[in-house]
Amino acid sequence: MKIGVHKIAMAAPNDVSGLKCLIDRGAVDPATIIALIGKTEGNGGANDFTRGFATPSFQLLLAPLLGLTPEEVGSCIAFVWSGGTEGVLSPHATIFTRSPSEVARTPRLALGIGITRDFAPEEIGRMAMVEAVAAAVHDCMNQTGITDPQAVHYVQVKGPLLTPARVADARARGAALATEDPNGSKAFARGAMALGVALGLGEVGATDLSDQVIARRLDLYSSVASTSAGGELKNCEVLLFGNSPAYGGDYCIGHATLSDVIDADGVRGALASAGLAVNSSVSPADANRIAVVFAKAEASPTGAIRGRRNTMLSDADINYERHARAALGAVIASITLDPAIFVSGGTEHQCAPGAAPIAAIVRASAV
């Protein structure tokens, strides 16, 4: 098997013309599409409806081509959106395909997909979510033929947060919630999903985990998890990326840790991990080898970066996640020469506090 990677620009959350063009010219067979990961131009908060707008737009395009209903398309293709394209970040989507291929001489990009059950409001940000994500991670590894967790470089999880309607439902039933603040629930949801990845990959032990540590014991974390929460989902979608000896194709993935949002060396480290050594910015030729970059952005909990105070955490007008996404997006784009980057905010249990994961998929050099 091999994984194909196709990045398209989006002029609006409902712009599917890029994918339609790829299909029309035969570059993508819709029957091979297994996942789509993208950035929309909303605010990234609990009231960001651009994500829920984008998914049905792509489902409506693909449904007649696959002979399915739009709802059935959503059952066989994973759609993961992150809202917020602040600064230079450009709205886009990356389409992933899977098709038959001979095995390569060295491990190549593999992608496993797991879907959890739906969660009740009182389970969001709790151990039920942690355990379900961990089970999905195990399933994804089995799908890809990856047996060594060190070969896993990026695990994208998108799941539900607590909307006002879900909070009201829980109150009516007398169910206790992790929090009753919809925007505040993002930290608990993201944290639970990240700890699920950490548990599934053996980065933390089951005895270390409980409801009480989620979004609190930040010394417990995964180095490869990237989690997002939105009101448009009831379950968690888990996409596990690694390099598998059972796969062929043209791509490899690598990862690194960003010490802060201006860590250019961390960006270069992720590219090098994927097989592309870069001293400063990439050359135009090497830029064409970079298929996609995924990163998380976080404001330092100290309120300072490299000894200099900033106002990310104290700005009453702009959420700190939006500040962080804008800053990191500019740093990455200055190196890769492409502002169509998947940068998501909030890193609860995703690397150590203040740090953040970054992964890059690169076209492999000839071997």
Protein language model features and the residues they cover:
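Terminal domain-initiation and capping elements
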Residues: 1-367
